Curated annotation (Swiss-Prot):
Dually phosphorylated on Thr-199 and Tyr-201, which activates the enzyme. Involved in mating signal transduction pathway. Keywords: ATP-binding, Kinase, Nucleotide-binding, Nucleus, Phosphoprotein, Serine/threonine-protein kinase, Transferase. Residues 39-327 form the Protein kinase domain. It comes from Schizosaccharomyces pombe (strain 972 / ATCC 24843). Its EC number is 2.7.11.24. One of its GO terms (cellular component) is cytosol. This is Mitogen-activated protein kinase spk1.
Length: 372
């Protein structure tokens, strides 16, 4: 990936080896990584909702990798997320999207208990970096640019990530950023050409776009741009912009900054319940982003305004944002590739059939794991 300026680095980046991680300790049975002899486990680096990650050495190449061990067979939703992530990450070949290097096949269908996905080893994530050191404006620009570069590829393929947040943005000591965790991704267009309908739960609350909270019906690529705005704000201030404790507090926090929606924006809200709730709130004036982020540059403030626009129809797109002056030092139209369209049926993958029996889903996963 070319850049027009020298890139920032993360101080002591090699000292933090936790990448896809939380601070919880995994259960003992999760620590049993059954790796083929060409891999040597180095150490545990993280735990997620239904899997753990270890650093390992691929002995034939000498390459250090991350091995993600997923146990999806306790719930159909975990199976569907695993299938979706494998299909999507195999589709994308992009510098700012985490790639699958290999999937370790089980000896047989009967012995398929866990799924082992081999990925690039990243040293940390943006969540940890924000909380461990102040970020310069150069850091904020470069990370924002790389997020937008990944979104351009995803959105050109007709894919919405739907769960962008700092912990899903993996980093190395050179500040290379890769978007991870595609388990909640969806197609922007359902079969038949109609906009996709939102499922009830998408995205971690603090990064959810208002159209998700207020039931605008259709979801679009714009929800990822809202999340990007929340992430940029968090990088600039070292704290979340909208840390809502529940649905109502989340809406209140958003409106306390963006102000009461205009009539035009209000008309986009389809849910009668949501419209009634908004009407019940007192009028709130918009707060200046410059007042909220006094140290931020005018370009950073302007991009924030365009990303954190209430109405998704008026929100800046990834392709437009890449041309914004805030990321001009890195923008290179010839090095910001699109991706081939992803068939909607592969992205949405039984999204309305989450009552599928686990044996059926296990067979689909077995077929996907053994696909070469």
């Amino acid at each position: 990936m070319a850049s027009a300026t020298s890139t920032p680095t993360i101080a002591d980046g090699n000292s933090n080896k936790e990448s896809v991680a939380t601070s919880r300790s995994p259960h003992t049975h999760d620590l049993n990584f059954e790796l083929p002899e060409e891999y040597e486990m180095i150490n545990l680096i993280g735990q997620g909702a239904y899997g753990v990650v270890c650093a390992a050495l691929h002995k034939p190449s000498g390459l250090k990798v991350a091995v993600k061990k997923i146990h999806p067979f306790n719930h159909p939703v975990f199976c569907l997320r695993t299938l979706r992530e494998i299909k999507l990450l195999r589709h994308f070949r992009h510098e700012n999207i985490i790639s699958i290097l290999d999937i370790l096949p089980p000896p047989s269908y009967q012995e398929l208990e866990d799924v082992y996905i081999v990925q690039e080893l990243m040293e940390t994530d943006l969540y940890r970096v924000i909380r461990s050191q102040p970020l310069s404006d150069d850091h904020c620009q470069y990370f924002t640019y790389q997020i937008l570069r990944a979104l351009k590829a995803m959105h050109s393929a007709g894919v919405v990530h739907r769960d962008l947040k700092p912990s899903n943005l993996l980093l190395n000591a050179n500040c290379d950023l890769k978007v991870a965790d595609f388990g909640l991704a969806r197609s922007t267009t359902a079969q038949g050409g109609n906009p996709g309908f939102m499922t009830e739960y998408v995205a971690t609350r603090w990064y959810r776009a208002p159209e998700i909270m207020l039931s605008f019906r259709e979801y679009s690529k714009a929800i990822d741009l809202w999340s990007t705005g929340c992430i940029l704000a968090e990088m600039l201030s070292a704290r979340p912009l909208f840390p809502g404790k529940d649905y109502h507090s989340q809406i209140t926090l958003i409106l306390n900054i963006l102000g009461t929606p205009t009539m035009d924006d209000f008309s986009r809200i389809k849910s009668a319940r949501a419209r009634k709730y908004i009407k019940s709130l007192p009028f709130t004036p918009k707060v200046s982003f410059k007042a909220l982020f006094p140290q931020a540059s005018p370009d950073a403030i302007d991009l924030l305004e365009k990303l954190l626009t209430f109405n998704p129809d008026k929100r800046i797109t990834a392709e437009e944002a890449l041309k914004h002056p805030y990321v001009a030092a890195y923008h290179d139209a010839s090095d910001e590739p699109t991706a081939s369209p992803m068939p909607p049926n592969l992205v949405d993958l039984y999204c309305n059939k989450e009552d599928l029996e686990i044996p059926v889903l296990k067979a689909l996963i077995f077929r996907e794991v053994n696909f070469r």
